[in-house]
Regions:
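Catalytic phosphate/metal-binding cores of nucleic-acid and nucleotide-processing enzymes, i.e., regions
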Residues: 1-150
Length: 150
């Protein structure tokens, strides 16, 4: 079932629930978020610069979580996070692993800060998947939170 905001909740017989979060926009040049290589460069330049980059990315994730989840909390952990990255078709192509790693770190921290999950340890987040696509429109990241339960 999809509501007017594009938020999707699916329930099935094994009581799995799925929610989606979208991070849309160009927050880092022509990309949605920086990659791990960009973060390492910032930390090498100055630790506070790297910390600021991480904090900025986390706040972008927090804004998206608040917009799409509207106070929803995981009640039946663990969860699996499914990421779909829509990168700009023009410009520099980036290493998929580095894009995913940094986004995953910032997003899981944001989930904790928003109290969607209590922790990002394996009791709460057991797995993740990631796919990459190219778009000639605005870049974005789609994150599906699948509540698996024990």
């Amino acid at each position: 079932m999809t509501d007017m905001n594009g938020e999707t909740e699916v329930s099935n017989l094994n009581s799995s629930t799925t929610k989606k979060v979208f991070i849309r926009g160009r927050f880092y040049g022509d990309k949605t978020l920086p990659s791990l290589n960009d973060a390492i460069s910032e930390y090498a330049r100055h630790p506070k610069a790297g910390g600021k980059m991480k904090n900025d990315c986390k706040w972008i994730c927090i804004a998206a979580i608040r917009k799409y989840l509207k106070g929803w909390k995981v009640t039946n952990p663990p969860i699996i996070l499914h990421y779909k990255f829509y990168e700009p078709i023009k410009g520099q192509k980036r290493d998929y692993g580095n894009i995913f790693d940094w986004c995953d770190k910032c997003f899981q921290d944001a989930l904790q800060d928003c109290k969607v999950i209590d922790n990002d340890n394996p009791d709460w987040v057991t797995n993740f998947t990631h796919e990459f696509f190219y778009t000639d429109g605005e870049p974005y990241i789609e994150i599906e939170i699948e509540e698996k339960g024990r």
